[in-house]
């Protein structure tokens, strides 16, 4: 007979931009941070921060910390830069979700929470744009 393990849920916030990937795991209310790791903490070179490899290593490290503190299942919220920036998450988002699953965490819902403007916002640089 298969033994059922008790699931303790948390929320994994994955912020994937073109410069870095951050993984933050909180409890279900979102008020207490359990683990917080970025891609820059696990690679040496700055150019490697946004890579899928850095996101994978950061997600694995965050999952180990969270599982040591008792959280073994997460709902994932993926976020890109949004606003006047890119509306799609960076290259590390999918790799981070895959690494969370491979680390032994149970994945619940996956949701995109990128901030999308409903009319528009004024881009930086003024009326004539950025002069180079």
Swiss-Prot record:
The keyword rRNA-binding applies. Keywords: Ribonucleoprotein, Ribosomal protein, RNA-binding, rRNA-binding. GO terms for molecular function: rRNA binding; structural constituent of ribosome. InterPro entries: Ribosomal_uS11 (IPR001971), Ribosomal_uS11_archaeal (IPR019961), Ribosomal_uS11_CS (IPR018102), Ribosomal_uS11_sf (IPR036967). Signal peptide: none annotated. Belongs to the universal ribosomal protein uS11 family. Part of the 30S ribosomal subunit. Located on the platform of the 30S subunit. This is Small ribosomal subunit protein uS11. It comes from Caldivirga maquilingensis (strain ATCC 700844 / DSM 13496 / JCM 10307 / IC-167).
């Amino acid at each position: 007979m298969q033994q059922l393990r008790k699931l303790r849920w948390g929320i994994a916030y994955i912020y994937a931009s073109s410069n870095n990937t951050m993984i933050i795991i909180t409890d279900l209310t979102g008020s207490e941070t359990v683990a917080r790791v970025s891609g820059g903490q696990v690679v040496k070179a700055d150019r490697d921060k946004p890579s899928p490899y850095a996101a994978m290593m950061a997600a694995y490290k965050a999952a180990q910390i969270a599982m040591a503190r008792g959280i073994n299942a997460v709902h994932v919220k993926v976020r890109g830069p949004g606003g006047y920036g890119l509306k799609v998450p960076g290259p590390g988002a999918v790799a981070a979700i895959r690494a969370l699953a491979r680390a032994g965490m149970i994945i619940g819902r996956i949701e995109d929470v990128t901030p999308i403007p409903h009319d528009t916002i004024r881009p930086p640089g003024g009326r004539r744009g950025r002069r180079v």
